[in-house]
Each structure stands twice: as C-alpha cells, then as structure tokens.
From Swiss-Prot:
Its main location: plastid. It comes from Epifagus virginiana (Beechdrops). It holds the Pfam family Ribosomal_L2_C. This is Large ribosomal subunit protein uL2cz/uL2cy. One of its GO terms (cellular component) is mitochondrial large ribosomal subunit. Part of the 50S ribosomal subunit. Belongs to the universal ribosomal protein uL2 family. Residues 224-253 are annotated as: Disordered. GO terms for biological process: mitochondrial translation. InterPro entries: NA-bd_OB-fold, Rib_uL2_dom2, Ribosomal_uL2, Ribosomal_uL2_bac/org-type, Ribosomal_uL2_C, Ribosomal_uL2_CS, Ribosomal_uL2_dom3, Ribosomal_uL2_RNA-bd_dom. It is found in: Plastid. GO terms for molecular function: RNA binding; structural constituent of ribosome; transferase activity.
C-alpha cells in the first residue's frame, strides 16, 4: 500500500502520513463489540499497565488463524483495515459458501485464489504443514500447538524462514532472530504479512496517538522522589544511580526478564538477538 502525505496546511497535518487501503464495510456476522472498562486497570481499578486508556471505540474482527478448511478453494473479496492490529485483513469467500477473515499476505490482491491442506502449491497465501514445505520458504501465522491455530509471526511485515527439518521437528528463524524448533505437523501460511511499511507511518500529532488508546509517557527524571527512583533533585538533575531503573526499582534497559527454566527453553536453539 502507498504512503500518502497530507498537504502542509496546518501544524497537525504537516508531518502526518496515511496509508491508503481498500475501503469496505466489515461483515456483520464476523464482528462483535468489546467491553473495555478502564484500560490498563485490574478489577480493583488500579493501574497495572501504564500509558493506556481512552481511544476510539472498536469492533473486533473475528480472524481465522486455524485455516482448517482443507482443499476448499477460496477467493479474496476485499482487503480491509483492522483497528485491532497493524496488519490488514482480507475477506475470503470459500467454495462451500463460508466467508472468513485472514491476515492479508503481502502481494495478494483481490481475486486471488487460496487453499489450505497437505501438498498444496507453494503460493503466497496458501496454508500447509511445515513437513510439506521446501527449505527456505518464507512463512507467517505459524502454529505452536497442532490444531490450535497460528500464534507466531502475525504482525505487519513479519516473516519467518524454514531453515531445517530433522526427525519430527522443523527449525525456524523468527523475525526477532530467535531460532526455534516446532513440530513438522504444525501448519503455517506461505509468504509475508502485508502492510510492510507501517513502521514508516508518521502520526503527525499527539491526538492521533490518543485515538489509538495510548496516553502520554512521562520521564521518571522529572517526577518527584515518591513517584520514581529517578525523581527529585534541584533543577535538571541526573538520576543519581549507577544504572537506570524501572518505577519499582528493578534494573531497566537490558536486564533479561524471561522466566528461568521455562518449559519452552528446550525448543529454543538460539535466543533472540537484541
């Protein structure tokens, strides 16, 4: 999709950009409302995740991550914007009359035909088990547990690579740089997730950020000592510590936070790179 620039008529539009997409109304049987009461709060109303709140009301689009319609050909009808993710979605009309949303693969256009199953062609948008894919295939929407649906590589522009197959396991290189083992029977979709240039988009103003449900981020060094370990001092003062910390006093910027001896450590060949 192309990036469109606003005319520099006002300060709020001077630096803003917008992506063009196919405009169409979502299907009513594939959407439902969400109940957001106090974003970033727990049941007691206490903030558990900072910098969240507000935002425009959204309708959730039901996405089919499983792709369990075996050997039933489907055609892409629309490519739509989804406010709940940074990737686009496309509506698939299958031969049996079923209609579903899936993540939009990069390069797929309206009118393309997709299919899922074993030994299907290696074409962008087709879904098949890892055991039937050749080495070097670019994939996304990857299952971790057989039959549970895709859980890995679903963000806009994300793509993984199948680099090896040995025994019952396949080796994948994920977008983070992590090399991980997954069962060869798990399914994945061929190609890369669309909307690759979403990270080049400029919101242009603070109000656009608030529409997304993201609140302002205040630096700890400008707070009071009771609010943050970096706070306090006369005027513009340093943090007063050897290393920066979180608001709760834990080391920040680089400390590994992954749980020790996690069950999935056995499937990680190489940890992600920073």
């Amino acid at each position: 999709m192309a990036i469109h620039l606003y005319k520099t008529s006002t300060p709020s539009t001077r630096n803003g950009t917008v992506y063009s997409q196919v405009k169409s109304n979502p299907r009513k049987n594939l959407i439902y409302g969400q109940h957001h009461c106090g974003k970033g709060r727990n049941v007691r109303g206490i903030i558990t995740t900072r910098h969240r709140g507000g935002g425009h009301k959204r309708l959730y689009r039901k996405i089919s991550f499983i792709r369990n319609e075996k050997y039933i050909y489907g055609r892409i009808i629309t490519i739509e914007y989804d406010p709940n993710r940074n990737a686009y979605i496309c509506l698939i009309h299958y031969g049996d009359g079923d209609k579903r949303y899936i993540l939009h693969p990069r390069g797929a256009i309206i009118g393309d035909t997709l299919v899922s199953g074993t030994e299907v062609p290696i074409i962008i948008g087709n879904a098949l088990p890892l055991t039937d894919m050749p080495l070097g295939t670019a994939i996304h929407n990857i299952e971790i547990t057989l039959g549970k649906g895709g859980q890995l590589v679903r963000a806009a522009g994300a793509v993984a690579k199948l680099i090896a197959k040995e025994g019952k396991l396949a080796t994948l290189k994920l977008p983070s740089g992590e090399v991980r083992l997954i069962s060869k029977n798990c399914s994945a979709t061929v190609g890369q997730v669309g909307n690759v240039g979403v990270n080049k988009k400029s919101l242009g103003r603070a109000g656009s950020k608030r529409w997304l449900g993201k609140r302002p981020v205040v630096r700890g060094v400008v707070m009071n000592p009771i609010d943050h370990p970096h706070g306090g001092g006369e005027g513009r003062a340093p943090i007063g510590r050897k290393k920066p910390t979180t608001p709760w006093g834990y080391p920040a910027l680089g400390r590994r936070s992954r749980k020790i001896n996690k069950y999935s450590d056995n499937f990680i060949v190489r940890r992600r790179s920073k």
